[in-house]
Structure formats: structure tokens, C-alpha cells
Regions:
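Glycine-rich active-site/cofactor-binding loop and its immediate structural neighborhood
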Residues: 59-107, 111
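Rieske [2Fe-2S] iron-sulfur-binding subdomain
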Residues: 1-78, 112-203
């Protein structure tokens, strides 16, 4: 059975005065949540942060979304999104918002990546003092990138890389901002509500 058929279907009501919604399990069931992460949250565009938070080259921000750790990275030219795991032993690379300079270094075996996700160093990967063994291709072991789009100050990602172009996907949302000159909006402050024990569909 396909993953789509496993998801709960919303019934169409023949009576316009009757509304059917999702069953209670869709808000509290762990398996349902995992299915959402692999379908609806993987297929579309997800908001993950603001570009103004990544001002300098080397600024990084870890984000946990749809059950996956990612990291946003600013280099001299652009902002990238990567899976926040080392290509060697899958250890988390970045645990806090900070500036890493020119290199993202794994705290386990010191595998090091540049700000475009390319592997630059893999100490002793071939044995003691064997840092560049024959047959080991550095280009095959970079960070796994994630499709990203920046709309004004908002950063969006798409996990499976198959989403429609952002402007097409988000057309109904963008339409609501037609009367607002977004270029004049200025960041004022951040309201941090901490961790909220709820389901994403309530937010």
C-alpha cells in the first residue's frame, strides 16, 4: 500500500451545514506524525527562519523541523540549507546559533566542510596519518543539501526537492500581501515562546 493511501482521507459532506475534519489521532498519534513528515511536510515548502538572522559569512542556525535536523549557513554570496549531520558518522554538526568562520567541523572525528557543504578535510580517514587515501573521493562526501528559497526575508525549504516553484506553490499566500510594500518592512524584535507542547496543525 502506498504511503498516500495510508493517510487519513477527509470525507466530503453532502450537507453544506456539516463539516468533517481530521480524526483525533491525526493530532496525537506518533505514527500519523511520522507519515506527515514523509509526505505533506516533505513535499511542500516549509518556513524555517529569517535571512536577517544570518548577516555575516559563517553565521549558522540549527533548525529541527519535520523530525529532521537541518542547518542554515551563510557564506559570502548566499544562504544554504543542509542536513545537520556529518557525512562520516551522522553526528550533529551544529548545536547552537553562532559564527563558525570558514569551516563547519564535526566534533567527533573533525571532518570539516566549507560554507558550501564541500568536504575539505577528513583526518586519518584511511588510517593513522592517512588523510587522503587512494580511492577516497572528497566530492562524494559533502553535506547533503536541501532545496531552499528566500522570499523577501523569509527562508523556506523543500526536503524532497520536488515542490513546485515557490511563487506558484505560495501564490494564494503571496496574493494576500499585494497591498503591502514588503521592501519597507523592518525587523523590530523576536518573540520567543520557547517549546510549545502542541501539534503543528494548531499553529
Amino acid at each position: 500500500m502506498s504511503r498516500e493511501k495510508n493517510l487519513v482521507k477527509i470525507k466530503k459532506s453532502k450537507n453544506p451545514n456539516t463539516i468533517f475534519g481530521l480524526p483525533a489521532k491525526s493530532y496525537i498519534d506518533e505514527d500519523f506524525w511520522k507519515q506527515e513528515c514523509e509526505t505533506v511536510l516533505s513535499d511542500g515548502w516549509l518556513f524555517v527562519g529569517f535571512s536577517h538572522e544570518l548577516k555575516k559569512s559563517g553565521d549558522v542556525i540549527p533548525v529541527f523541523i519535520a523530525n529532521k535536523p537541518i542547518v542554515l549557513v551563510r557564506n559570502r554570496d548566499d544562504i544554504f540549507a543542509f542536513h545537520n549531520v556529518c557525512s562520516h558518522r551522522c553526528l550533529k554538526l551544529v548545536n547552537e546559533k553562532k559564527n563558525v568562520g570558514k569551516i563547519i567541523r564535526c566534533p567527533y572525528h573533525a571532518w570539516s566542510y566549507d560554507l558550501k557543504g564541500k568536504l575539505k578535510a577528513a583526518p586519518h580517514v584511511g588510517g593513522t596519518n592517512q588523510h587522503k587515501p587512494k580511492g577516497f573521493n572528497f566530492s562524494d562526501h559533502g553535506l547533503k543539501s536541501i532545496k531552499i528559497h528566500i522570499w523577501h526575508d523569509w527562508i523556506f525549504i523543500n526536503f524532497n526537492g520536488k515542490a513546485k516553484k515557490f511563487e506558484e506553490y505560495a501564490r494564494p499566500l503571496i496574493k494576500k500581501f499585494d497591498d503591502i510594500d514588503l521592501t519597507k518592512l523592518k525587523y523590530a524584535t523576536t518573540l520567543d515562546f520557547g517549546k510549545i507542547n502542541t501539534n503543528w496543525k494548531f499553529l
